[in-house]
Amino acid sequence: MDTVVINAVTKKFGQTVALDALSLTIPMGQMTGIVGADAAGKTTLLRIIIGLLAADTGSVATLGLDPATQKKELTARIGYMPQKFGLYEDLTVRENLEFYADLKEVAKDFSKLLDFTGLEPFQDRLAGKLSGGMKQKLGLACALLGDPEFLVLDEPSVGVDPISRRDLMHLVKTTITPKTTVVWSTAYLDEANSFDNTIVMDQGKVIYNGSPSALAATSAAFEREVIRLMGGYEEKPSQIAAHYVYRESNIEYPVEALDLLKMYGSFAAVKNNTFHIKRGEIFGLLGPNGAGKSTSFKMMCGLARPTAGTAKIMGVDIKKNPTLARSYLGYMAQKFSLYGNMSVRENLEFFAGIYGIPFAEIKERVDNIAAHFGLAVYFDQLSEQLPLGIKQRLSLACALIHNPPILFLDEATSGVDVVTRKEFWCHLRALAEKGVTILITTHFMDEAEYCDNISLFYKGETIAIGTPAALKQQAGATTMEEAFIELINRKDAESGLL
């Protein structure tokens, strides 16, 4: 018996076709992963399956019920974890659980879930104050209330570190029964390759539905096959880098952190952090959620004042001359920091003004960078309406509009599909070859392999620094993900936490 049976379902939003005469089945008692390009229709599909959206045409049966007409009966039998975890950040951990228990009309006995997820000591903490990994666990706990027959997880591992991803997978696999069906959409192909079944989507259609092993025998081959199914990827010379004009300088280390310390009361968020980044180097800051990476980023950008130590940008102390130091930076934040109610052109014009480009030059600069980034066709579209990959491209254009010699990228590929990530890194490597110095944080360990050097950050301090090859050798690992987990575990063992 199948948990989900879909026949010829179409869903449109205005003139945009989200699902195009889509048909599929999802087997009962198995874990099924869903992957696909941005705007492939993954989230729309999941919402139709559980009754949050209605199909325009076609039929849907979930657990033998029609989600459109039997939503209440269906809701009692499913657990759903939306993107960004679906939490109320101004409620505590316990209050979130109580709220979802009321919605599901189930008993408010949370002791097992709190113990299982490790959240028991934090039940009175506001959800908004939790780390990414803890939010992830709370979102899962809310979805598991009532022991659902069908668990639907929409990109639950986006924006969290490898240890949190591993913990989430372990929690799910040890919680479900042999009869539980799990559907898990993901941007991580290693996750998709670990499930019983994998669905690959593109442009509102299912282009593969079967076991990962039937698609490819190895993880590397699986990635190649998924990319091929999604239309393939051919690396081309970066037009973005080709039109970038580097500001010449004789500064050996454009970015320097010297004994940076950041205290919040008695808590040390960053402890004596030191690193030097050469011209044209890609330097990665890796670490678990809550390790202090974002705090370090904020200090290097002048958005947070160090308690002690020095941050230098192109030799300029950012505490002494923040305006000059920031003029050398292009900054691309998590979630891209675009203004959703402004058009693509308006966002570019705004950032050009913020970065100090003379008013008389802004139109020409905006027109040129839009042409190089392939954004002109979207000029009049609101940025909130753009596909995720185009938002990413627009955010990078905003960061580069003043030709900065330094780029700071804070999880700039979070939630973006594998092909878009490869294109993005093609541009970054080409920019680095032209002399741009890049500081980047990421939770994708395959991206860490592209960095020239890496600082592994944990509990506010650097626990390892070097090339990817050196860190793997130090950990006795064959992949960066294995090295990441091993070095963190070693640090915990030294501290008596393991």
Model-predicted regions and their roles:
Residues 50, 301:
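Helix-to-loop junction immediately C-terminal to a conserved catalytic motif
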Residues 58-66, 73-74, 309-317, 324-325:
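Conserved ABC transporter NBD signature motif
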Residues 98, 102-122, 349, 353, ...:
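Conserved ABC ATPase "signature" region
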Residues 140, 168, 396:
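Hydrophobic anchor residue at the start of the ABC signature
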Residues 151-155, 160, 407-410:
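Catalytic Walker B motif of ABC-type/P-loop ATPase nucleotide-binding domains
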